[in-house]
Amino acid sequence: MIELKHVTFGYNKKQMVLQDINITIPDGENVGILGESGCGKSTLASLVLGLFKPVKGEIYLSDNAVLPIFQHPLTSFNPDWTIETSLKEALYYYRGLTDNTAQDQLLLQHLSTFELNAQLLTKLPSEVSGGQLQRFNVMRSLLAQPRVLICDEITSNLDVIAEQNVINILKAQTITNLNHFIVISHDLSVLQRLVNRIIVLKDGMIVDDFAIEELFNVDRHPYTKELVQAFSY
């Protein structure tokens, strides 16, 4: 379970980015955080990950095995390491897997799942496309077998086929390894395919919180309706 109680946060004392955030996410629930750029979505993710501490309020996680997948994969990889080295480091660090043969077998299985060529493993991060690197980024996090996954705009660099591939993989992982994941996105179609609950942020505050089946209900917050209408164009 993830629980935020009256969480307030600001990068300086004059302006709060998030104000009085109250969220409870039970095990097994996948949640999308929806809102425009600058509304506090990524800051909220950073707080859950423990990268920042709230100015006020409390954050509780029942499981400490929480990992992020960030929007820009190039900043998530060591530029001097091959893709293979970075992936195997995750297997060693998070799972204690040191046997090279076992590591290779896991990598080959995941390469097939993510529809990536094994020849790319010898490349540096700067030598593969942004879409390929983002798929490797997702792969690395899943190889680490986290219980909670925080996904921050992870499909922004992917074409539509690769995007659906990653979504299918994450949905399958929900059944196997993950307790739940939180998806930060401005793309409503991604959230509709991935989560069963949406929380809407506006100006650092929660203005709506509903099950995905209730997205088009007439009693949705006016801002939620505005986002839905904007996306439909």
UniProtKB/Swiss-Prot annotation:
Protein's membrane topology: Peripheral membrane protein
CDD domains: ABC_NikE_OppD_transporters
Protein name: Nickel import system ATP-binding protein NikE
Organism classification: Bacteria, Bacillati, Bacillota, Bacilli, Bacillales
GO cellular component, one term: plasma membrane
Quaternary assembly: The complex is composed of two ATP-binding proteins (NikD and NikE), two transmembrane proteins (NikB and NikC) and a solute-binding protein (NikA).
Induction field: Transcription is stable during the exponential phase and increases only in standard conditions in late exponential phase.
The entry's keywords: ATP-binding, Cell membrane, Ion transport, Membrane, Nickel, Nickel transport, Nucleotide-binding, Translocase, Transport
Molecular function terms from GO: ABC-type nickel transporter activity; ATP binding; ATP hydrolysis activity; transmembrane transporter activity
EC number: 7.2.2.11
GO terms classed as biological process: transmembrane transport
Organism: Staphylococcus aureus (strain NCTC 8325 / PS 47)
Main location: membrane
Subcellular location: Cell membrane
Annotated Pfam families: ABC_tran
Free-text function comment from the UniProt entry: Part of the ABC transporter complex NikABCDE (Opp2) involved in nickel import. Probably responsible for energy coupling to the transport system. Required for full urease activity and plays a significant role in the virulence of S.aureus during urinary tract infection (UTI).
PANTHER family on file: TRANSPORT ATP-BINDING PROTEIN
Family: Belongs to the ABC transporter superfamily.
